[in-house]
Curated annotation (Swiss-Prot):
Citrate synthase-like protein; part of the gene cluster that mediates the biosynthesis of squalestatin S1 (SQS1, also known as zaragozic acid A), a heavily oxidized fungal polyketide that offers potent cholesterol lowering activity by targeting squalene synthase (SS). SQS1 is composed of a 2,8-dioxobicyclic[3.2.1]octane-3,4,5-tricarboxyclic acid core that is connected to two lipophilic polyketide arms. Gene3D superfamilies: Citrate Synthase, domain 1 (1.10.580.10), Cytochrome P450-Terp, domain 2 (1.10.230.10). This is Citrate synthase-like protein. SUPFAM superfamilies: Citrate synthase. The active site is at 357, 413. The lineage of its organism: Eukaryota, Fungi, Dikarya, Ascomycota, Pezizomycotina. The gene is R3. One of its GO terms (biological process) is carbohydrate metabolic process. Residues 13-40 are annotated as: Disordered. GO terms for molecular function: citrate (Si)-synthase activity.
């Protein structure tokens, strides 16, 4: 099969695409045409595809660099070993590296330029000029809130911010040395069980959330508070400290810090977590967001989807990378061991967490903002003995041809742990805080899905003997 790019222009013959002696007047189906058929673009771009199996030419519309899978599936050829049965063309794309499964108006990324925007607003502008609650509002409802809208938004989160007794009782029965994410998921599962609307939605034919934005918006507010309150409850249980009641008039992050009893008189801690959270609020269809939406396509409740997303994010190749990156620095032990470690990475014996990203071909814009935050906490971060190891890895990887030629640059995970630890946040609680960070993007994608036609996500596979 040969593919030739079609450009907008004059009507053209494409008989020179193939050896005319091979055509033999064969007709193709659907979008197909003969080699001697002129193609009028009429302002539309096409791929002109010659199928050597059938000697047919197909004209596949191209829109903004994408072709639709349904258009490709109009290309068919006899199935080998069958008596004339036709097999539609499909795409094999392990890891979804070249496949878009949805259209979205939420987040834009240009990996070649290192550009990230939420609803058209540059990540740098949000980081410097707005807080996390405003960013949540922007992501979910498509605009930065007015002062009145922000007050109302924060009040609504406060009204559902106290965890029910059932949640507290379940969490307090868990061993304090249990894996933090396991405790977090247990608490959230219990919280979900206390929400009658969500549990009822799984057992009725009438769709609770789809095309019902008021119900969807109310559920989004509850989800924000459920996650924050559960994380605070788990933290207080592990640390053996009192869980404080939420306080009206505080932001989501400020209330979380208040509930765990962390003193923040000058709001330096909350403002830092706010900006770290803005940095991680959404990233198109990350692994966890895709997992969330995969489950959401069955029209279950948002907390069920969220449990799936948190589980996906806990893996070392995704949200767990921040913690694993820090553990890697501990294993290296000293600056003197960095050259040997870099050599082992190049020999593919180890993975260098915190470097490289599937999307970005230059430095992740979030990494630059993380470095900026580090300067505000320089004294506490400099006291961390692992920092010099990280700096030396960064220096060597940034100049080594192996990394440069492969366009492997610093990403948002590499230095993130240093800031959380400098703030006094326990390392095992960082994945939970990252969940709060990602809530805006997850809820925005869910709301977008609930407002659009639904098809259950059911990828194909290629059977292999």
């Amino acid at each position: 099969m040969a593919i030739v790019n079609g450009a907008v222009g004059k009507p053209q013959h494409i008989s020179d695409m193939v050896d005319s002696t091979k055509m033999n007047g064969n007709q193709s189906q659907d979008t197909a045409g003969r080699a001697d058929t002129p193609v009028s673009n009429g302002g539309q771009d096409y791929l002109h595809v010659f199928d050597s199996r059938t000697c047919n030419i197909h004209h596949i519309p191209v829109s903004d660099g994408f072709v639709r899978g349904s258009d490709l599936s109009t290309i068919a050829a006899p199935l080998k070993g069958s008596s004339g049965r036709m097999q539609k063309l499909a795409v094999l794309d392990p890891g979804f590296q070249h496949t878009a499964c949805k259209e979205s108006s939420i987040t834009f990324i240009d990996g070649e330029k290192g550009e990230l925007r939420y609803r058209g607003v540059r990540i740098e502008d949000l980081f410097h000029d707005h807080d996390f609650d405003s960013t949540l509002h922007l992501l979910v409802w498509g605009r930065l809130p007015t002062k009145e809208e922000k007050i109302k938004f924060e009040r609504r989160m406060f009204e559902v911010a106290s965890p029910p007794q059932e949640v507290c009782d379940v969490i307090r029965k868990l061993p304090k040395n249990m894996d933090f994410i396991s405790m977090f998921l247990t608490g959230l599962s219990t919280y979900m069980g206390t929400d009658e609307e969500m549990t009822r939605s799984r057992h009725q034919a009438v769709m609770t959330y789809h095309k019902n934005l008021q119900t969807t918006d109310d559920a989004i507010i509850r989800c924000f508070s459920y996650v924050s309150a559960t994380l605070a409850t788990v933290y207080c249980h592990v640390k053996g400290v009192e869980l404080h009641h939420p306080q009206e008039g505080l932001t989501l992050v400020e209330n979380f810090l208040h509930m765990i009893g962390m003193e923040d008189p000058d709001k330096k801690i909350s403002r830092t977590i706010d900006r770290l959270s803005i940095n991680m609020a959404d990233h198109e269809l990350s692994c966890s967001t895709a997992a969330f939406l995969h489950v959401a396509s069955s029209l279950t409740d948002p907390m069920t989807c969220l449990l799936t997303a948190i589980s996906a994010a806990s893996g070392p190749l995704h949200g767990g990378a921040l913690e694993v990156c820090y553990q890697g620095l501990e294993l290296i032990g000293s600056v003197d061991n960095v050259p040997a470690y870099i050599a082992a990475v190049k020999a593919k014996k180890f993975r260098l967490f915190g470097y490289g990203h599937r999307v970005y071909k230059i430095q992740d814009p979030r990494a630059a903002l993380t470095k900026e935050l580090m300067e505000e906490h320089r004294e506490a971060i400099d006291a961390n003995p692992l920092l010099q190891i990280a700096v030396e890895i960064d220096r060597q990887a940034n100049t080594d041809p192996y990394f440069v030629e492969r366009k492997l640059k610093l990403n948002a995970d590499f230095y993130g742990c240093f800031i959380y630890i400098a703030l006094g946040i326990p390392r095992d609680m960082i994945p939970g805080l990252l969940t709060i960070s990602r809530m805006g993007g997850l809820m925005a994608h869910w709301r977008e899905a609930m407002n659009n036609p639904i098809k259950i996500w059911r990828p194909m596979q290629k059977f292999k003997l």
